[in-house]
Amino acid sequence: MERKRWECPALPQGWEREEVPRRSGLSAGHRDVFYYSPSGKKFRSKPQLARYLGGSMDLSTFDFRTGKMLMNKMNKSRQRVRYDSSNQVKGKPDLNTALPVRQTASIFKQPVTKITNHPSNKVKSDPQKAVDQPRQLFWEKKLSGLSAFDIAEELVRTMDLPKGLQGVGPGCTDETLLSAIASALHTSTLPITGQLSAAVEKNPGVWLNTAQPLCKAFMVTDDDIRKQEELVQQVRKRLEEALMADMLAHVEELARDGEAPLDKACAEEEEEEEEEEEEPEPERV
């Protein structure tokens, strides 16, 4: 086997480089490169060579196959080192004297001086935009799972929604729909019509009208109005009966409490009259 070994000028003095050609196999003709230290130790790869030399030599630009230093990599590394050293030497002075604290807007009203070149111009403002705060989509779902209790700490039974009301959106239950409609009745002055767009069922995250509750569009018929009127009349009648019973009970309680003091006062008046009759009249001289 033909072996050629010669001195490697890129490495320290005494290091030799050897090329061994392969005679057979799929990689026939390929040459294996080895390096030998002055003591005769053999190295088969660049990592072995770097571990052996350690910090005595920089092998970042060394080509293990050719045994030479790559000049383009050497120039780039020199430029990088020169740039880093110049930055470290010069540096930018920190002239900022502000305290390193977060600057937030003041919650207190502060005077503002208005300077303008056109005093006749008027500033237009829309107070409605400042009042209406943006809301999350499907924020009504946060109200689901909440229950109401009366003064006796008993659970209040939730009302049943009409059959014509159907929810819209992912995971919209009857409880969520009831909370959404109740919130719309208390927080909005607009008429409740539901989601009028038909595309909201395909992609509610895009076509949802945030001004309306999470329900499909519905129509209020005369039959619905009649049923609601009957329900209101029944509730009013029950309320009237309850108020009347409470008033009668209150009157009876006052009557029972007023009998004893009244009898006692009458008895005291009779005793005073008897004492006045028993007193003798003074004799006349």
Swiss-Prot record:
Places the protein is found: Nucleus; Chromosome
GO biological process, one term: positive regulation of DNA-templated transcription
InterPro entries, per database record: DNA-bd_dom_sf, MBD2/MBD3_p55-bd, MeCpG-bd_2/3_C_dom, Methyl_CpG_DNA-bd
SMART domains (UniProt xref): MBD
Sites of the Glycyl lysine isopeptide (Lys-Gly) (interchain with G-Cter in SUMO2) crosslink: K73, K90, K92
Single GO term (MF): DNA binding
Tissues expressing this chain: Highly expressed in brain, heart, kidney, liver, lung, skeletal muscle, spleen and testis. Detected at lower levels in embryonic stem cells.
GO cellular component entries: chromatin; cytoplasm; heterochromatin; nucleoplasm; nucleus; NuRD complex; protein-containing complex
Biased composition (Basic and acidic residues): 255-267
Modified residues (Phosphoserine): S56, S85, S144
Coiled coil: 221-279
Highest taxon of source: Eukaryota
Swiss-Prot/TrEMBL keywords: Chromosome, Coiled coil, DNA-binding, Isopeptide bond, Nucleus, Phosphoprotein, Transcription, Transcription regulation, Ubl conjugation
Bias-annotated ranges (Acidic residues): 268-285
Region of interest: Disordered: 255-285
Domain named MBD: residues: 1-69
Subunit-level organization: Heterodimer (via N-terminus) with MBD2. Component of the MeCP1 histone deacetylase complex. Component of the nucleosome remodeling and deacetylase (NuRD) repressor complex, composed of core proteins MTA1, MTA2, MTA3, RBBP4, RBBP7, HDAC1, HDAC2, MBD2, MBD3, and peripherally associated proteins CDK2AP1, CDK2AP2, GATAD2A, GATAD2B, CHD3, CHD4 and CHD5. The exact stoichiometry of the NuRD complex is unknown, and some subunits such as MBD2 and MBD3, GATAD2A and GATAD2B, and CHD3, CHD4 and CHD5 define mutually exclusive NuRD complexes.
Function statement: Acts as a component of the histone deacetylase NuRD complex which participates in the remodeling of chromatin. Acts as transcriptional repressor and plays a role in gene silencing. Does not bind methylated DNA by itself. Binds to a lesser degree DNA containing unmethylated CpG dinucleotides. Recruits histone deacetylases and DNA methyltransferases.
PANTHER family tied to this protein: METHYL-CPG BINDING PROTEIN, MBD, METHYL-CPG-BINDING DOMAIN PROTEIN 3
Entry protein name: Methyl-CpG-binding domain protein 3
Source organism per UniProt: Mus musculus
Taxon lineage: Eukaryota, Metazoa, Chordata, Craniata, Vertebrata
